[in-house]
From Swiss-Prot:
This is Ribulose bisphosphate carboxylase. It comes from the Bacteria. Mg(2+) binds at K191, D193, E194. One of its GO terms (molecular function) is monooxygenase activity.
Length: 466
């Protein structure tokens, strides 16, 4: 059934829809299956996303038609479809009238992902008007709270040097806590890796008690505040709360030094909202493990990493992993800095829409995945700032002189970039950074050719056979 007469209105202008403030706008890259027309398929897509079905039904009235989602722009050559969703379509909490990502996704990314006439459709951007945006929680705290704990300025406080304890699984409580202590002697922030939680060989209660003690010892030894991000992910909201309460109680006087990590993609919006509302004074660390199943450029369905991170800010994540923008080991491009800008700025340009956040707190980019001291200056140069949390696992524990030197090398790389000093020049006066070149010679050869001569390091590579 061709529904284009009802669900398509190409006379609508985007600027008028934005000025009206009554529609959520979504941009999809969509391709119909062979034999289906583009506009007719886009209309069916909008119908399935809102008030329609595959046949006319007798219960439809004028009010129903007034809240139809409407296709307002198509560009078949670019496979672009833009749809306007009336804000009234998205349901709200009965307890407080707040909006929810669950409803947003059910409409914009629900049944339309399994339609028989659509070969693929992926959301690349969305726009929320002020009245709807204000119904979301947004972050309660962000990196400014961590800078305050660290004794830094709460604006432009710079890089938080962090790591992930490796191996990601297999450490029992005592060696895990000792690894934390070792890194904290040189670094700021440690996070649970996303699978770490309450394994039989590493009960959460035992591990957290030892980590809290390791933090106290490291702070006493260095005279510096330290930070820990504890994984409280669970299926059951009551389990999330129980874990969070135990963690904060155990850290005691250092409870403000604790972030609470939730695997937001796999555990879902309910887990993020539970943590955001139950623990508003603590940094909510949104890990996105599993997101690549839908956000990867190789996937033509679902939504992009940009969309995922934008939703995280609405939900109230204090920080979310954003990848390394092509400077680490994970998928990414230098242009992914647009994700960081959308998370941190009060008004930012996305792939299709310019979004105003109306004063909503920023969400902090968290950087991980193959980063080390040698890769960091290029990353900062591409981003334009260093106001991020770095969690470098191999970059710290893979340092030739151990995790303390690894942590210091990461900090020194940031300081070199901050001060505008070439990394090799800075390394001549900072041994931990210099030894990072020997720790990661493959990266050093690629990024800093000639580093051995510059640092006076003997070239021990075997000569190639003639």
């Amino acid at each position: 059934m061709d529904q284009s007469s009802r669900y398509v209105n190409l006379a609508l202008k985007e600027e008028d829809l934005i000025a009206g403030g009554e529609h959520v706008l979504c941009a999809y890259i969509m391709k119909p299956k062979a034999g289906y027309g583009y506009v007719a398929t886009a209309a069916h897509f909008a119908a399935e996303s809102s008030t329609g079905t595959n046949v006319e039904v007798c219960t439809t009235d004028d009010f129903t038609r007034g809240v139809d989602a409407l296709v307002y722009e198509v560009d078949e050559a670019r496979e672009l479809t833009k749809i306007a969703y009336p804000v009234a379509l998205f349901h709200r909490n009965i307890t407080d009238g707040k909006a929810m990502i669950a409803s947003f996704l059910t409409l914009t990314m629900g049944n339309n992902q399994g339609m028989g006439d659509v070969e693929y459709a992926k959301m690349h951007d969305f726009y929320v008007p002020e009245a709807y945006r204000a119904l979301f929680d947004g972050p309660s705290v962000n990196i400014s709270a961590l800078w305050k704990v660290l004794g830094r300025p709460e604006v432009d406080g710079g890089l938080v040097v962090g790591t992930i304890i490796k191996p990601k699984l297999g450490l029992r409580p005592k060696p895990f806590a000792e690894a934390c202590h070792a890194f904290w002697l040189g670094g700021d922030f440690i996070k649970n890796d996303e699978p770490q939680g309450n394994q039989p060989f590493a009960p959460l209660r035992d591990t957290i008690a030892l980590v809290a003690d390791a933090m106290r010892r490291a702070q006493d030894e260095t005279g510096e505040a330290k930070l820990f991000s504890a994984n409280i992910t669970a299926d059951d909201p009551f389990e999330i709360i129980a874990r969070g309460e135990y963690v904060l109680e155990t850290f005691g006087e250092n409870a403000s030094h604790v972030a609470l990590l939730v695997d937001g993609y796999v555990a879902g919006a309910a887990a993020i909202t539970t943590a955001r509302r139950r623990f508003p004074d603590n940094f909510l660390h949104y890990h996105r493990a599993g997101h690549g199943a839908v956000t990867s450029p190789q996937s033509k369905r679902g939504y992009t990493a940009f969309v995922h991170c934008k939703m995280a800010r609405l939900q109230g994540a204090s920080g979310i992993h954003t990848g390394t923008m092509g400077f680490g080991k994970m998928e990414g491009e230098s242009s992914d800095r647009a994700i960081a800008y959308m998370l941190t700025q009060d008004e930012a340009q996305g792939p299709f829409y310019r979004q105003s956040w109306g004063g909503m707190k920023a969400c902090t980019p968290i950087i991980s995945g193959g980063m080390n001291a040698l890769r960091m200056p290029g990353f900062f140069e591409n981003l334009g700032n260093a106001n991020v949390i770095l969690t470098a696992g191999g970059g710290a524990f893979g340092h030739i002189d151990g995790p303390v030197a690894g942590a210091r090398s990461l900090r020194q790389a940031w300081q070199a970039w901050r001060d505008g000093v070439p990394v090799l020049d800075y390394a001549r006066e900072h041994k931990e950074l210099a030894r990072a070149f020997e720790s990661f010679p493959g990266d050093a050869d690629q990024i800093y050719p000639g580093w051995r001569k510059a640092l006076g390091v003997e070239d021990t590579r075997s000569a190639l056979p003639a």
